[in-house]
A protein has these predicted regions:
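Ligand-recognition elements built from short beta-strands and adjacent flexible loops
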Residues: 260, 346, 410-477
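Beta-lactam-recognizing serine transpeptidase/beta-lactamase-like catalytic domain environment
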Residues: 67-78, 119, 123-164, 169-394, ...
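Short, small/polar residue-rich loop motifs at catalytic or cofactor-binding pockets
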Residues: 60, 113-116, 187
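Soluble periplasmic/extracytoplasmic beta-strand elements of cell-envelope proteins
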Residues: 6, 16-18, 33-37, 55, ...
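Conserved, well-ordered alpha-helix/loop/beta-strand core segments that scaffold catalytic motifs
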Residues: 74-117
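Small/polar-residue-rich segments within soluble enzyme cores
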Residues: 1-86, 388, 406
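Flexible, solvent-exposed loop/hinge segments and secondary-structure transition points
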Residues: 11-12, 42, 105-126, 134, ...
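Extracytoplasmic/secreted proteins, especially bacterial periplasmic and envelope-associated proteins
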Residues: 2, 6, 29, 33, ...
C-alpha cells in the first residue's frame, strides 16, 4: 500500500488508482476447510464459498445506453434488469468451539507426530455441525501456501475403516434381532477364534463376559460371535439405517459417501471383520452422525453446516430402549474400559475407542495405524457427538484410547461449559428418552472452563471479540 501511494503521488500521466475489494478471512486457517475461498473474481473455489456461490454472489443488473459515433451519450441509461445483492449465510459453527477444537487437535497431531487429524462435533438435538477441523491446514489469506494435501476437508472427504468404533452398532443389531439381550453372556475363551484358515484374536483371554464387557474390553471375538449368530444382513441393514454408506446431505463439495460391502455370499471371516469395523469405510462425519442416533434415543437427523431455523423431526431408525442401553454400555467403556482417558470432570460421558491398521501397497501395515474415538457428552442426556481421528501417529502411542480419547476429553469438557450445560444425573433410563433427573453429588466440583484465545491464530481483530463473547457465556453459566 505504501508503494502504491508513492506511485500515485508522482501524478504520472495515464496512471491512476482503482479500488478493488478482496475477501479477507478473519478466522484464517481455523475455518478454512469449511468456508473455503474465492478466486480473483470473487467466485467460490472451495468449501461453502463454492457450494453457495450463487447465493452469496447475487446477480448483476443491466442498463442500456445509446451513444453516437463519437462515443458521446445520446440517450440516458435505461434500466433493463435490477441488480440483486448476495444473500447472507449463517453457519451452524460456534466459533468458540471451532477454535478450541482446532487448538486441541493441532496439539495432539504435533504431540503424536501424526500425518493428519480430524475432529467433528455435532449437536445431537439438531444435527447441526458445531465444529469441524482438520490438520494439516492452510491460510486462505495466504495463497502461496495452498497445497492440495492441506486443503482437503478430511472430515467429509477422507474414508477410513472405523475399527472398534463400529462395535456398538454390531451390538445394537444383535440386541435388535432378539437373539441377544443386554445381559447375555458370550464365551470368548481362549482369546483366539479360528475361522477356517483365519483367526480372530483378543488382546487376552476374557473368558465368559456379558455384552457390556464385550464393549468395555473391546472384544473382537465377542462381536464376531454376535455377528456370526445373527448374520451379516441384519448388521448391514442397521449400518445403512444409521447413515453409513451414504452422503450426510450437507451439500459440501467433494463429500464422500463411504463404502458398505454388499455381497451375495459372505465368508465367516468377512462377517467377523465387518463386526469390528474392517472391510467398510466411513467418513468422520458419517460416524458422528451415526453416534447421534445413539444419543437421540434412536432418531436420525440430517447433518447441516447451516444454522437451522426449524429443527427437523428426523426419523426413527433404532428402538429407543436399545439406543439407551447402548449409551449405558458406552459409559462403561469410559469408566473402566479402553476409553478411560476420555473422562472429564463433573460430567459423565460415553464413547468407543478404535485403532485401525492403515492400508498400504501390500495390504494392511504392521506398524501404521489410525487412532479414533467416537463419543457422546453428557451421556445421561447427550448434547454433543464428537469424533476424533489421529492419522498415522508415529510416537510411542498409537491406540485410539491414547491418541484420540484425550482430545475428546478436552474438547467435550470445554464445549459443555461454554454451552452452559449443567452436570446432571449419570444413569440412562432404558425406557425414557430423557436422562435421569437425579442431581449430581455435591462432591463434584463444577468449574467454568475458559477458552484460551491467541491472536497468533485468530488474528488481532477476532480474538478480542471472541473473548468478550466468552465472558458473557461464563457469566451466564
Amino acid at each position: 500500500p505504501e508503494q502504491g501511494a508513492g506511485v500515485i503521488a508522482l501524478k504520472v500521466p495515464g496512471v491512476q488508482a482503482t479500488d478493488e475489494q478482496r475477501r479477507y478471512y478473519p478466522a484464517a486457517e481455523v475455518t478454512a476447510h469449511i468456508v473455503g475461498f474465492t478466486d480473483i473474481d470473487e467466485t467460490g473455489q472451495e468449501g461453502l464459498e463454492l457450494a453457495y456461490n450463487d447465493w452469496l454472489s447475487g446477480q448483476p443488473g443491466k442498463r442500456r445506453t445509446l451513444k453516437d459515433r463519437k462515443g458521446r451519450l445520446a440517450r440516458q441509461a435505461e434500466l433493463i434488469e435490477s441488480a440483486s445483492p448476495g444473500k447472507e449465510l449463517m453457519l451452524s459453527i460456534d466459533l468458540r468451539l471451532q477454535y478450541m477444537a482446532y487448538r486441541e487437535l493441532r496439539q495432539a497431531v504435533e504431540k503424536h507426530r501424526a500425518s493428519a487429524g480430524s475432529l467433528v462435533m455435532l449437536d445431537v438435538k439438531t444435527g447441526e455441525v458445531l465444529a469441524m477441523v482438520n490438520q494439516p491446514v492452510y491460510n486462505p489469506n495466504n495463497r502461496s501456501d495452498m497445497q492440495a494435501y492441506k486443503m482437503r476437508n478430511r472430515v467429509l472427504t477422507d474414508m477410513v475403516e472405523p475399527g472398534s468404533t463400529l462395535k456398538p452398532f454390531t451390538v445394537a443389531a444383535a440386541l435388535e434381532s432378539g437373539q441377544f439381550q443386554k445381559n447375555s453372556v458370550i464365551n470368548t475363551s481362549p482369546g483366539i477364534m479360528r475361522l477356517g484358515r483365519d483367526k480372530v484374536k483378543d488382546i487376552r483371554n476374557y473368558g465368559s463376559i456379558d455384552i457390556t464387557t464385550v464393549l468395555r474390553k473391546s472384544s473382537n471375538i465377542g462381536v464376531s460371535k454376535m455377528a456370526l449368530t445373527i448374520g451379516p444382513d441384519k448388521v448391514m441393514d442397521l449400518l445403512q439405517r444409521v447413515g453409513l454408506g451414504q452422503s450426510t446431505g450437507t451439500g459440501f463439495p467433494g463429500e464422500s459417501a463411504g463404502y458398505l460391502p454388499f455381497r451375495d455370499r459372505w465368508s465367516d471371516i468377512e462377517i467377523a471383520t465387518l463386526s469390528f469395523g474392517y472391510g467398510l469405510t466411513v467418513t468422520p462425519l458419517q460416524l458422528a452422525q451415526a453416534y447421534t442416533v445413539l444419543g437421540s434415543g434412536g432418531i436420525l437427523r440430517p447433518v447441516s453446516l447451516i444454522k437451522r431455523d426449524v429443527i427437523p423431526d428426523g426419523i426413527r431408525v433404532l428402538d429407543q430402549r436399545i439406543a439407551n442401553d447402548l449409551r449405558n454400555m458406552l459409559r462403561e467403556v469410559v469408566h473402566g474400559g479402553t476409553g478411560g482417558r476420555a473422562q472429564i470432570d463433573a460430567f459423565e460421558v460415553g464413547g468407543k475407542t478404535g485403532t485401525a491398521r492403515k492400508v498400504g501397497e501390500n495390504g494392511y501395515s504392521k506398524d501404521r495405524y489410525i487412532g479414533m474415538f467416537a463419543g457422546l457428552a453428557p451421556i445421561n442426556d447427550p448434547r454433543l457427538a464428537i469424533v476424533v481421528v489421529i492419522d498415522d501417529p508415529t510416537g510411542q502411542a498409537y491406540y485410539g484410547g491414547l491418541t484420540a480419547a484425550p482430545v475428546f476429553s478436552n474438547v467435550a469438557a470445554g464445549a459443555l461449559r461454554l454451552l452452559g450445560v449443567e452436570p446432571a444425573g449419570n444413569a440412562v433410563s432404558s425406557t425414557s428418552s430423557t436422562s435421569s433427573t437425579s442431581s449430581t453429588s455435591s462432591s463434584i466440583a463444577y468449574v467454568p472452563w475458559r477458552l484460551p484465545l491467541e491472536e497468533k491464530f485468530m488474528g488481532p481483530i477476532l480474538a478480542p471479540e471472541l473473548n468478550s463473547v466468552q465472558n458473557i457465556a461464563l457469566k451466564k453459566g
